[in-house]
């Protein structure tokens, strides 16, 4: 705890950006996420390495742009938040001002009627640190954070480096299982054997357990931050997975980035791979942004949902593009442009940026896209009716109804229902249609024909055959 307060975490801890604290016989592992942008990078790979986010806000500064950005990243990663208002010992400290600013971002702390815990601390003097640690333990207890130890280890690469003496080194946080020296692992497209394990103090250890940050030696190449680290019993299994991932990587190199466009997201929603349309809005003034955001949110219904992951004033920058890429969102610019670096990164990551100067055009384009995702209404449309006037038995076919077309037409393979004295006694398909001895595709009103129905031969004179078809009608948002 003293190290946390004073920042004296040691060279190794500062380097790997992770350290452990013992509190009431329980262990808390802190990951220095701002240092290596864990939220966006790991969210982009579908991972959730953090269980709880501690959002530290300076009591004398208020919400800074990077704090607001951190809130957006935490929400995008769906990780619970605990607020730590720091520097409460300073003369200009105003915790209530901070809480009010947080409420504007839909972050309501407990004493403001919300569910988010908040601690008042001074990292410099150590004030409130015990309370913050207690709140972390309470949140962990509510979330029932547990991980199995008696299984093969899995983890996530926090960061990596090429050490002159040690070679490729990956800092991994263990998420489940027990990691041992000598085990076979797969990380990204490489597989190898754990040569050594170093704890946060740089000491060699034989084991690493869930929530332990550990430096792993034995990589063939420097691993990528955010990659999964998985132990396998059999080397042949690890090798097989490694070869397959290598093949996929080679294919990806020869393909363009999968562009995150409105059409692509629409296809994912249609196929059931997604149920939300994520949108990031950038605009020139707050009023326009709020109006556009509210209008787009109102387009949501039970089938498709518009989710605004970020709305802010200003040009589109690189952080906006990273968040959009991680969340599979499109970017809407209202009366603003994109920075040069933002445009460059959007091309690299394949993020779609759409520009508008008229609010109704933006709303209408999103509305049309969402309407295209709605399942169509199915309506029944009558094609024709026929009256049974005679019965014929034809070799190899069976009973055929000699009919007169009273209305419309009848079409081979159409859906039909057979009525007798006003009651439906059978529903099926028109499988045989003849004019005299010849097969016919359709017979029009006023003509006579022979009709055969699948799995039905019990015709009676005066039966009525109704032929119909089901048509899809495009729905509109209400």
Task: Describe each PLM feature range.
Residues 139, 257-273, 277, 398-399:
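Phosphate-interacting basic helix/loop segments used at nucleotide- and nucleic-acid interfaces
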Residues 238-265, 269, 371, 378:
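Charge-rich, low-complexity alpha-helical coiled-coil segments
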Residues 1-235, 239, 278-282, 286-298, ...:
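P-loop/Walker A NTP-binding module and the surrounding RecA-like catalytic core of P-loop NTPases
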